[in-house]
């Protein structure tokens, strides 16, 4: 699929099998084949999340400049959904390492929002030779609330859906994701609920949540380790983020040696959706595609 062809779910859809304590099927989208620089996109962890929907306003634009791989993280989209696994970010980073090996990728920039940002950081810490520049949007594992209450409104809504997975609870969760509530259309809610409400997805969601309280939970506390990152890191936050509030960015900004922070006003947790045009330009420039 070249950068000039029309991009659809079907035309970009790919599968790979990697080994993480046994075979694990990963689904991903590929676009911009032929461009020199590969960029990997990692979606967030809300119910019904997947790479195609989370990056629907970004893939085609980024593919004009980069070879884009938008990966469904384990337990999401069309990737395998296990009922048990270790700390999620480390588990997902191991799966991503397997995909890198299978595709023959070297050092690659990573773009991750929320849970995907945490996976990107875990990957960069565990496999430093394979991770290039990082673009992190409201990333999990780095956000330490200095002023906002914890758990946040978004985390509470996520927990409520896990306990009672209804369409109404999903819509309430999605509305917390954004500043502009008009973005949460009935069609989007239906699409996300169809993905989130299958028995396999519900099992995977609970396994993901449980993994943050397991014996290896400290692998998710990456704010304690990010001083080791040596690549440039772009932190992007929505001022009205109610999942990982803006004050949570300050520890990461202070600790990551080559970090910079960009904040969008009138924007919630879904920066790449609400401010897609500005986000795309900022990301392209930071990753070198604007030259």
From Swiss-Prot:
The keyword Lipid biosynthesis does not apply. InterPro entries: AB_hydrolase_1 (IPR000073), AB_hydrolase_fold (IPR029058), HsaD (IPR054676). The active site is at 269 (proton acceptor). It is an enzyme of class 3 (hydrolase). Substrate binds at residues 45-46, 54, 113, 115, 192, 270. It holds the Pfam family Abhydrolase_1. Disulfide bonds: none annotated. It catalyses: (1E,2Z)-3-hydroxy-5,9,17-trioxo-4,5:9,10-disecoandrosta-1(10),2-dien-4-oate + H2O = 3-[(3aS,4S,7aS)-7a-methyl-1,5-dioxo-octahydro-1H-inden-4-yl]propanoate + (2Z,4Z)-2-hydroxyhexa-2,4-dienoate + H(+); 2,6-dioxo-6-phenylhexa-3-enoate + H2O = 2-oxopent-4-enoate + benzoate + H(+). Keywords: Aromatic hydrocarbons catabolism, Hydrolase, Lipid degradation, Lipid metabolism. Its EC number is 3.7.1.17, 3.7.1.8. GO terms for biological process: biological process involved in interaction with host; lipid catabolic process; steroid biosynthetic process. The keyword Lipid metabolism applies. GO terms for molecular function: 2,6-dioxo-6-phenylhexa-3-enoate hydrolase activity; 4,5-9,10-diseco-3-hydroxy-5,9,17-trioxoandrosta-1(10),2-diene-4-oate hydrolase activity; hydrolase activity, acting on acid carbon-carbon bonds, in ketonic substances. Pathway: Lipid metabolism; steroid biosynthesis. Homodimer. PANTHER family: ALPHA/BETA-HYDROLASES SUPERFAMILY PROTEIN, LIPASE-RELATED. Catalyzes the hydrolysis of a carbon-carbon bond in 4,5: 9,10-diseco-3-hydroxy-5,9,17-trioxoandrosta-1(10),2-diene-4-oate (4,9-DSHA) to yield 9,17-dioxo-1,2,3,4,10,19-hexanorandrostan-5-oate (DOHNAA) and 2-hydroxy-hexa-2,4-dienoate (HHD). Is also able to catalyze the hydrolysis of 2-hydroxy-6-oxo-6-phenylhexa-2,4-dienoic acid (HOPDA) and the synthetic analog 8-(2-chlorophenyl)-2-hydroxy-5-methyl-6-oxoocta-2,4-dienoic acid (HOPODA). This is 4,5:9,10-diseco-3-hydroxy-5,9,17-trioxoandrosta-1(10),2-diene-4-oate hydrolase. It comes from Mycobacterium tuberculosis (strain ATCC 25618 / H37Rv). The lineage of its organism: Bacteria, Bacillati, Actinomycetota, Actinomycetes, Mycobacteriales. The gene is hsaD.
């Amino acid at each position: 699929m070249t950068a000039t062809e029309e991009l659809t779910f079907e035309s970009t859809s790919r599968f790979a099998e990697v080994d993480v304590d046994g075979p694990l099927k990963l689904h991903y989208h590929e676009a911009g084949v032929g461009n020199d620089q590969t960029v990997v996109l990692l979606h967030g962890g809300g119910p019904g999340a997947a790479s195609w929907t989370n990056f629907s306003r970004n893939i085609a634009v980024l593919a004009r400049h980069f070879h884009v791989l938008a990966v469904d993280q384990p337990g999401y989209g069309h990737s395998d959904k296990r009922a048990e696994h270790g700390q999620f970010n480390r588990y997902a980073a191991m799966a991503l390492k397997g995909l890198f090996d299978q595709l023959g990728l070297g050092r690659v920039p990573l773009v991750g929002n929320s849970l995907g940002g945490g996976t990107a950081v875990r990957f960069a810490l565990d496999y430093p030779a394979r991770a290039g520049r990082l673009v992190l949007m409201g990333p999990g594992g780095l956000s330490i609330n200095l002023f906002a209450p914890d758990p946040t409104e978004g985390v509470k809504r996520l927990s409520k859906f896990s306990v009672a997975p209804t369409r109404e609870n999903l819509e309430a969760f999605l509305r917390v994701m954004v500043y502009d509530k008009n973005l949460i259309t009935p069609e989007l809610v239906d699409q996300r609920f169809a993905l989130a409400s299958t028995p396999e997805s519900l099992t995977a969601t609970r396994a993901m949540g449980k993994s943050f309280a397991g014996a290896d939970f400290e692998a998710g506390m990456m704010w304690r380790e990010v001083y080791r990152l040596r690549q440039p890191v772009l932190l992007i936050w929505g001022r009205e983020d109610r999942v990982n509030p803006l004050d949570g960015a300050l520890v990461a900004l202070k600790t990551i040696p080559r970090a910079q922070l960009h904040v969008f006003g009138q924007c919630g947790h879904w920066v790449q959706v609400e401010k897609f045009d500005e986000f795309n330009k900022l990301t392209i420039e930071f990753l070198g595609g604007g030259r």
